[in-house]
Amino acid sequence: MKVKASIAATVALLVALSSTAFAQDRRDIRLAEDIGRSITTYARLTIFDDINATVENGVVVLTGRVTMPYKKDDLEKRITKVDGVRSVRSEIGVLPVSQFDDELRRRVSRAIYGNPSFWNYAVMANPPIHIIVEGGHVTLAGVVNSNVERMLARSLATGLGELSVTNSLKTDAEVKSE
């Protein structure tokens, strides 16, 4: 009788803990969606910035790169105000000022968004391909529809005076499976 009672108590405790964990996961998912909206509606975010956020138990970690220091501060403040956020840890880096990098950003963005295959992205309020340039090294980040678009974007970003190109673009299918 005691064994059955302790097994039942253990099962009840495990169910309670797992449902609490499940509820916290759901809150974190909802919070991540709210944070995503807050980031994408930040008017000063451009295709030359890339911000990512992770959420665990209401604690938000911001990562990525921005072109100006005030953007880092603004984003931290915006995320802190999102309902449900307990704390924010910012690991956002500010890209160094460089005329060479600025010119390279313009060349790469014209090459990609000037290509007819990417015109549908170019007209979006927040185009999905982000072009991060640091010290002549180009990183493509964001989401595209297919692997063909990912390969084309990388090809278009090559041969414009860059030292290297890192293609961190993901397809819609890859993002959905995460």
Walk through the language-model features, giving the residues of each.
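N-terminal targeting leaders
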Residues: K2-E178
